[in-house]
Amino acid sequence: MPELPEVEIVRQSLNKKIKGKVIKKVLVRNRNLRFKIPYNFEQFLNKKKIKKIDRFSKYLILVFQDNSACVIHLGMTGTIHLVMKNNFTNITNTSFYNNFILPKKHNHIEIKFNNFKLIYNDPRRFGYFSYFKNDEEINNNFRKYGPEPFDPLFDRNYIF
């Protein structure tokens, strides 16, 4: 399972590559991840412009211009790859992925942009994608998890 620093590196890398981009098309190849992906997932993400990529604990949050969001958890073996559309060159940050050969049967979700696509690859299918329509839904979802590890509220007094 990716640890918090790895998830933060993925967030930073995605912020550099997809922030400000518009999703052109979403393709779900397998809805049976840890939680079943809803049938309107593609419709929800289609044509959304990415405002920023946040992180809460080990969750990646794609925040869109309309303040809706897509929340991603990588599970045990999930990885995110950015691949150029025409020549299949992997443009993912190479410092945290050793092998760019992606078995296609584990490419469960593709989010397509103009010149490249984001591929979610997960052999064990323990990761998941969900979406939230606004800030209130997002905050309600994460309220039960306690403070973010880098939040000033997370100190020795909170623990003890």
Please report, for each region that a protein language model flagged, where it lies by residue.
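Phosphate/anion-contacting hairpin/loop surfaces
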Residues: 70-160
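Extended, highly charged segments
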Residues: 1-70, 74, 85-93, 110-114
